[in-house]
């Protein structure tokens, strides 16, 4: 695309091409200028750590596009992906929230099935992105959801409502996969206490900090991911579905207040924003307490109707010992031979 022909869609410096020539980034005719090729030529790291994440969204919502550009993200084709695509269906806020939690599951880039996933199909890889073995460089996949995210959000904008009500930031701290997206209305003038500065910092844990509470729970789950993640998902869906279900009623009430006095609507939505954030953090603390009790020391205590089962007598809760997944045990035996074989003593 020639940027000079797209002034309604592109904002750029008058010297965007001449500066590239001056720096040696571009030497062709103006009509052939590519901003991306000049200022950020694609290398393997950019392809696999950045472009592949875009591909994952396309693959989720436009299957034909995903299939067509799989060779591109695998480094087998140089045909770049389109800037945007039309999804196969109309997407909801919940669709985008769930997409933010993707780790390439079910695709050729899935990282839950190889040795790096550990025994419990952990869809994460520790940084750095690359490593060397015997002088050869290798890489770790970088999916949409990663553990080092500080925050993520889905921005919802609706022209059929006043700006004060129509703009909502569905905001979550830490890894998108294991956070709760809570509504933050754009007219909010008071930051939720658990989101604000002053509660903990980069070297100080705080039970009043949403960032640290979400990190605490996520770091508990990752090492035993396949065993523990569904307990987290149950609470996450419970909260997010509640916020989604309540949205229409909340905004209807806000609209009535707005028509009376916009300041009343602001106060109402500010209180609601703060309440949702605090409710999620409080529930996440309860989740963390539940997880550490249920999965203590590698066992799994039994649950009935969402509650841990108490012993009929004594102080040992009913539990099971799930151990390691069968495939992992087979891999151990394959790697170690008879090292751990139980022998019959003569």
Q: Could you tell me what each predicted segment is?
A:
Residues 9-238:
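Structured mid-domain segments that build the active-site/substrate or prosthetic-cofactor binding neighborhood
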Residues 173-179, 184-346:
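Charged low-complexity "KEKE/polyampholyte" interaction tracts
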Residues 1-6:
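Conserved small/polar residues in nucleotide/adenosyl-binding loops
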């Amino acid at each position: 695309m020639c940027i000079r022909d797209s002034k309604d869609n592109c904002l750029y410096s008058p010297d965007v091409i001449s500066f590239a020539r001056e720096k040696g980034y571009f030497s062709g005719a103006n009509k052939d200028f590519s901003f991306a090729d000049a200022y950020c030529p694609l290398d393997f790291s950019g392809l696999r750590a950045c472009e592949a994440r875009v591909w994952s969204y396309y693959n989720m919502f436009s299957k034909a596009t995903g299939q067509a550009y799989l060779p591109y993200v695998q480094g087998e084709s140089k045909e770049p992906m389109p800037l945007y695509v039309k999804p196969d269906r109309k997407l909801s806020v919940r669709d985008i929230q769930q997409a933010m939690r993707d780790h390439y599951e079910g695709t050729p880039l899935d990282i839950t099935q190889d040795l790096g996933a550990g025994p419990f199909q952990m869809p994460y890889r520790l940084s750095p992105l690359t490593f060397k073995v015997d002088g050869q460089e290798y890489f770790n996949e970088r999916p949409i959801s990663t553990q080092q995210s500080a925050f993520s959000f889905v921005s919802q904008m609706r022209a059929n409502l006043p700006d004060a009500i129509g703009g909502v930031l569905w905001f979550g701290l830490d890894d998108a996969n294991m956070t709760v997206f809570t509504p933050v209305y754009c007219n909010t003038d008071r930051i939720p206490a658990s989101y604000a500065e002053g509660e903990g910092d980069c070297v100080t844990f705080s039970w009043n900090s949403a960032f640290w509470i979400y990190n605490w729970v996520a770091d508990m789950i990752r090492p035993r991911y396949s065993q523990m993640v569904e307990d987290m998902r149950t609470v996450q869906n419970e909260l997010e579905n509640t916020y989604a279900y309540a949205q229409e009623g909340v905004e209807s009430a806000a609209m009535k207040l707005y028509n009376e006095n916009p300041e009343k609507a602001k106060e109402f939505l500010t209180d609601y924003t703060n309440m949702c954030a605090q409710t999620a953090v409080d529930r996440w603390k309860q989740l963390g307490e539940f997880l550490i009790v249920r999965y203590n020391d590698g066992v799994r205590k039994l649950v009935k109707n969402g509650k841990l089962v108490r012993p009929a007598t004594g102080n040992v809760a009913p539990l099971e010992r799930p151990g390691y997944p069968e495939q992992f045990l087979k891999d151990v035996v394959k790697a170690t031979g008879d090292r751990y074989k139980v022998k019959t003593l003569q």
